[in-house]
Amino acid sequence: MKKNQFLKESDVTAESVFFMKRRQVLKALGISAAAFSLPHAAHADLLSWFKGNDRPPAPAGKPLEFSKPAAWQNNLPLTPADKVSGYNNFYEFGLDKADPAANAGSLKTDPWTLKISGEVAKPLTLDHDDLTRRFPLEERIYRMRCVEAWSMVVPWIGFPLHKLLALAEPTSNAKYVAFETIYAPEQMPGQQDRFIGGGLKYPYVEGLRLDEAMHPLTLMTVGVYGKALPPQNGAPVRLIVPWKYGFKGIKSIVSIKLTRERPPTTWNLAAPDEYGFYANVNPHVDHPRWSQATERFIGSGGILDVQRQPTLLFNGYADQVASLYRGLDLRENF
């Protein structure tokens, strides 16, 4: 794997500005304004997001042991870990960016069970400790591009998904990989109430083609900024596919199933004209309601310092992944 050529020191994203909002999307889906008026003290105004010290600190995750392969490092300095995860997209805990940090402490991540099933010769079940001990962990500094036209760079910690799938031995019938988030309404208020959860159908589901899942860039992620993932960021394990829009990065995964047919995915079910199965970052294919040609890079500065920059095809990973889609119409298969 060649060294990523698109990252430079100034690209590293401040942890205090990790996520942004998708309220416009929910309005388009017909979700009532009541969903945006939840009586929660954590519903801060957007400007407070840039103040840094006003955001609740991330829950302390345990330090992880991991390597730092040179191909993914670029010697980039990182923002202190106590500013991570102030704003998140995790609708199971509410729509506002402050809601997951405020509410995700209710999620019990240990014990945890992750099952790998379907078109495999050797079905597997992993427990909480397996996620951080069974595979060598490595830190990878990846660009992350949200479908909402903002971007950042994050040092994820995890292991390539292909290593896990190889243990399960996919059969010749396996063509796709389906992922599912835990369904725990008693712990996740957004799964109990459609207004809190944005009207989505739960549990959250995602999917990849098998060749996408087996690509070396695709990461099963268990940590960020040197420590185990906090619950609002998808603990104990989430998916990162850096050349795709962020909603493909399903959180708190309990099931991975290899299938013959293309699996359903949550945002595609909710709005198929707006969110495709592939969700590859593409500056030439706009969202129906906004351009994808440029993006707001979110760094450590204030609101006036947010810079707009050109969106890179496949989020800057075209050299590594473009061959996966040779001959595929990327406008039709968005």
UniProtKB/Swiss-Prot annotation:
Main subcellular location of this protein, as a coarse class: periplasm
CDD domains on file: YedY_like_Moco
Enzyme Commission number(s): 1.8.5.-
Cellular component GO terms held in the UniProt record: periplasmic space
Binding locations of Mo-molybdopterin: N88, Y91, E92, C146, T181, N233, R238, G249, I250, K251
Signal peptide as annotated in the record: 1-44
Gene Ontology biological-process annotations: protein repair
Catalytic activity: L-methionyl-[protein] + a quinone + H2O = L-methionyl-(S)-S-oxide-[protein] + a quinol; L-methionyl-[protein] + a quinone + H2O = L-methionyl-(R)-S-oxide-[protein] + a quinol
Key word Signal present: yes
Cofactor: how and how many bound: Binds 1 Mo-molybdopterin (Mo-MPT) cofactor per subunit.
Pfam families per record: Oxidored_molyb
Changes after translation: Predicted to be exported by the Tat system. The position of the signal peptide cleavage has not been experimentally proven.
Cofactor(s) required, per the database record: Mo-molybdopterin
Subcellular location: Periplasm
GO molecular function: metal ion binding; molybdopterin cofactor binding; oxidoreductase activity, acting on a sulfur group of donors, quinone or similar compound as acceptor
Enzyme class: oxidoreductase
Alphabetized UniProt keyword annotations: Metal-binding, Molybdenum, Oxidoreductase, Periplasm, Signal
Domain of life: Bacteria
Recorded family membership: Belongs to the MsrP family.
Subunit organization: Heterodimer of a catalytic subunit (MsrP) and a heme-binding subunit (MsrQ).
Function: Part of the MsrPQ system that repairs oxidized periplasmic proteins containing methionine sulfoxide residues (Met-O), using respiratory chain electrons. Thus protects these proteins from oxidative-stress damage caused by reactive species of oxygen and chlorine generated by the host defense mechanisms. MsrPQ is essential for the maintenance of envelope integrity under bleach stress, rescuing a wide series of structurally unrelated periplasmic proteins from methionine oxidation, including the primary periplasmic chaperone SurA and the lipoprotein Pal.
Family annotation (NCBIfam families): PRK05363.1 (NF003767)
Protein name (record): Protein-methionine-sulfoxide reductase catalytic subunit MsrP
Organism: Escherichia coli O7:K1 (strain IAI39 / ExPEC)
